[in-house]
């Protein structure tokens, strides 16, 4: 973490605002807008872009991906411009937590992968690109979204350390740990060989 130079009260307000932004369930809203039905009753029941893709609508999945990543990036950039770097990291973490545990959905949200990428790339674009490269390489090789996310989450703090961005190591460890926790059912399916591949419709 960077040195905390901002007043704690202001950091708390930044965190609350970022959390409420991150908690917006864009996947659910887009699925309804596209007439795809209740996303909670489709595929895995998750509200993220991967599950939206299982409806067969690539435009809806792309829109969900962009908006879920965008809320993390927007929270970071706005906090950085208005307050400072310490607030930017708080905002990124809070937006991620909002997506995973949204107050609007009784704290039952998504797995945070897109918001993770949006947050990381806004905090450090080289780190975000490196994490994205790991996701793409794993997805290309194995065609499994969850495995790609897990590998990217695992490697991001290692990249942060290697790039000399020590102030991002703790945050990326925290976010990566939560991604692994949120993917615990996927990990079980990966170990049993039953995890669906990208584009597969899970019924």
UniProtKB/Swiss-Prot annotation:
Domain of life where this protein originates: Bacteria
Instruction: Provide the topology term for how it sits in the membrane.
Output: Multi-pass membrane protein
The EC number on file is 2.3.1.275
Catalyzed reaction equations = an acyl phosphate + sn-glycerol 3-phosphate = a 1-acyl-sn-glycero-3-phosphate + phosphate
Pathway assigned in UniProt: Lipid metabolism; phospholipid metabolism
**Where does this polypeptide localize?**
Cell inner membrane
Q: Where are the transmembrane segments?
A: 10-30, 59-79, 87-107, 116-136, 168-188
What UniProt keywords are attached to this protein's entry? Cell inner membrane, Cell membrane, Lipid biosynthesis, Lipid metabolism, Membrane, Phospholipid biosynthesis, Phospholipid metabolism, Transferase, Transmembrane, Transmembrane helix
Keyword Transferase (UniProt): yes
Q: Which PANTHER family match?
A: GLYCEROL-3-PHOSPHATE ACYLTRANSFERASE-RELATED, INNER MEMBRANE PROTEIN YGIH
Quaternary structure (record): Probably interacts with PlsX.
- Please describe what this protein does: Catalyzes the transfer of an acyl group from acyl-phosphate (acyl-PO(4)) to glycerol-3-phosphate (G3P) to form lysophosphatidic acid (LPA). This enzyme utilizes acyl-phosphate as fatty acyl donor, but not acyl-CoA or acyl-ACP.
The UniProt entry, under NCBIfam families, shows: glycerol-3-phosphate 1-O-acyltransferase PlsY
Task: Cite the HAMAP family for this sequence.
Answer: PlsY
Q: What is this protein called?
A: Glycerol-3-phosphate acyltransferase
User: Which organism encodes this protein?
Assistant: Dinoroseobacter shibae (strain DSM 16493 / NCIMB 14021 / DFL 12)
């Amino acid at each position: 973490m960077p040195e905390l130079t901002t007043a704690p009260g202001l950091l708390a307000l930044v965190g609350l605002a970022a959390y409420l932004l991150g908690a917006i369930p864009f996947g659910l809203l887009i699925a309804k807008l596209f007439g795809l039905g209740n996303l909670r009753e489709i595929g895995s029941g998750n509200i993220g872009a991967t599950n939206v893709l299982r409806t067969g609508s690539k435009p809806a999945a792309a829109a969900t991906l962009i908006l879920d990543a965008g809320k993390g990036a927007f929270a970071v950039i706005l906090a950085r411009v208005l307050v400072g770097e310490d607030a930017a990291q708080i905002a990124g973490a809070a937006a991620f937590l909002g997506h995973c545990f949204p107050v609007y959905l009784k704290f039952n949200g998504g797995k945070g992968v897109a918001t993770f990428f949006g947050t990381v790339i806004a905090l450090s674009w080289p780190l975000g690109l490196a994490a994205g490269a790991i996701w793409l390489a794993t997805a290309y090789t194995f065609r499994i979204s969850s495995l790609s996310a897990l590998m990217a989450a695992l490697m991001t703090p290692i990249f942060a350390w290697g790039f000399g961005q020590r102030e991002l190591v703790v945050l990326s460890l925290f976010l990566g740990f939560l991604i692994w926790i949120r993917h615990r059912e996927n990990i079980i399916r990966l170990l049993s060989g039953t995890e669906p591949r990208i584009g597969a419709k899970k019924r």
